[in-house]
């Protein structure tokens, strides 16, 4: 049985990437996902005790990558979805990346306890309610005005992505990480730039190794 673990990165968690990674491996996690914790919808980001700052997230990603890369080099690979995504994009295999890195949102049927349906678990908000699973068909839900509006929203990119050297990898990041007011901007933009500058050479090395392995299959 394969085990997939979703880890929410808080301010406290970000201080101990080595402990987090090793403990997840001890649990038998073969597939790992790390996402920044959510601040309350109302209010400023970064003011809660658990809030994850861009600087802390950048340091966390760099250290986590060191640990992950060391395992990969020892032929002890564990999947970390974010890193896998970047390698797939480098291999021009963007179809294997997820919505948080491909630059556009899809529409998923997220069903709440009362039957309400939303296009994404991060956007289970009244403005994006597509309908109700007990009252609407799947066709009606997928063709709803909210679904269409969400797909259009999901095509946007921050203006600073236009001239960013990392844009082909990052694609603006997950829309959930964007600032909640003002023009589109990823709250963790600096964290991602720090990470790419730190890990680029080794990401390329892994991508080349993966490409060679595929050619020998």
Feature roles, as predicted:
Residues 65, 99, 106, 139, ...:
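Generic hydrophobic alpha-helical scaffold/packing signal
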Residues 124-217:
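Flexible mid-to-C-terminal extensions adjoining Fe-S/redox cofactors in radical SAM and related proteins
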Residues 2-104, 110, 124-130:
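Radical SAM enzyme [4Fe-4S]-AdoMet core and its adjacent flexible, acidic
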């Amino acid at each position: 049985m394969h085990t997939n673990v979703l880890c929410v990165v808080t301010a406290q968690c970000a201080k101990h990437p080595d402990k987090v990674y090793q403990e997840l491996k001890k649990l038998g996690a073969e597939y790992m996902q790390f996402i920044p914790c959510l601040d309350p919808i109302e209010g400023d980001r970064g003011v809660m005790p658990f809030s994850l700052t861009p600087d802390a997230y950048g340091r966390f990603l760099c250290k986590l990558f060191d640990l992950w890369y060391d395992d990969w080099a020892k032929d002890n690979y564990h999947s970390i979805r974010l890193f896998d995504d970047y390698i797939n994009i480098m291999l021009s295999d963007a179809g294997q990346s997820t919505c948080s890195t491909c630059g556009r949102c899809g529409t998923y049927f997220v069903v709440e306890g009362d039957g309400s349906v939303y296009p994404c678990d991060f956007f289970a908000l009244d403005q994006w309610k597509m309908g109700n699973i007990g009252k609407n068909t799947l066709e009606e839900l997928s063709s709803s005005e909210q679904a269409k509006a969400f797909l259009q929203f999901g095509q946007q990119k921050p203006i600073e992505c236009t001239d960013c050297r990392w844009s082909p990898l990052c694609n603006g990041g997950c829309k959930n990480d964007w600032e909640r007011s003002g023009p589109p901007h990823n709250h963790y933009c600096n964290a991602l730039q720090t990470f790419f500058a730190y890990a680029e050479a080794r990401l390329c090395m892994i991508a080349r190794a993966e490409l060679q392995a595929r050619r020998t299959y």
